[in-house]
Amino acid sequence: MRYIIPVLSILFFACGENKEPMIEVLQSIETSKIEPPKSLMQLYYDKHNQDSLYSISKGTVSNGKLSNAVLFPPKGNNYNYFSEQSYLKGRAFVNSEVKDILLDALASLENIVPNQQFQIMEIAHEHGGELWPHRTHQKGTSVDFMLPKMKEGKVDYSLDQKGISHYFLNTNNNGVYDDSDGVKINFESTAKEILALNKAAILNGWKIKKVILKIELLDDLFKTPSGKKLKQLKIYFAKSLTKKVNEVHDDHFHIDFEKK
């Protein structure tokens, strides 16, 4: 910048009354601004994504395969993929139609919850199969969603940048995170997110087959205004889970999508 100002001054006086060369110089400087470097996740996306493919999911969510997978984008206007480490290890591949469902739902949420950034968590490997330590996620139709959070009535993202370790966060049965100074689950935003996902699934010819959220948190979810609407839809929420599976679904909710 220290050298640009003197150069512009010389050009200005050299141009005299003819302003056109000066305007061209300014426009050239404006258009030649250096773009910020792409993130590692964006570079990975650019290299591996194949949006034109139509995916085929075979088998079950716990014993399945995925062909022609597409890669979920690392970020958008109101969402991010939660972990660079997970993304670069190829754990964000998805069935192409499920990707459409997610993007349609997130687009609608821009208007429904305009002040909320959502976090997409792990999905599947490029060819499906085991995604350790998950018991499912094997055919690109299972998706984990980070639970939206709040503190003192306001949106809070203080725990959202933990990456993979977010899976190890714990809440009490009222949705308050341990050692967080009062950060808690935003159940209203959670319900709105699931409603949007359900609507997008239906419009794309799919449905939500199952939602997994810690059972002790369901009452607080269904008490919210949007939670009451969610309960009326009779979407299946798992009510019988092993202790281990139940306990690990307090920082996120899991959805299995199924084509109608």
Give the location of each predicted region.
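Positively charged n-region of N-terminal signal peptides that target proteins for export
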Residues: 1-4
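C-terminal motif of bacterial Sec signal peptides marking the signal peptidase cleavage site
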Residues: 13-14
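N-terminal low-complexity, Pro/Thr/Ser-rich intrinsically disordered segments
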Residues: 22-68
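Catalytic cores and adjacent binding grooves of peptidoglycan-active enzymes
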Residues: 23-30, 154-260
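Active-site acidic/histidine clusters and adjacent loop/turn architecture
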Residues: 50-120, 186-202, 207-208, 212
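Extended, low-complexity, intrinsically disordered C-terminal regulatory tails
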Residues: 101-132, 210-240
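Envelope-exposed proteins and targeting segments
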Residues: 114-116, 139-143, 249-253
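Acidic/His-rich structured neighborhood in mature extracellular/periplasmic domains
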Residues: 125-176
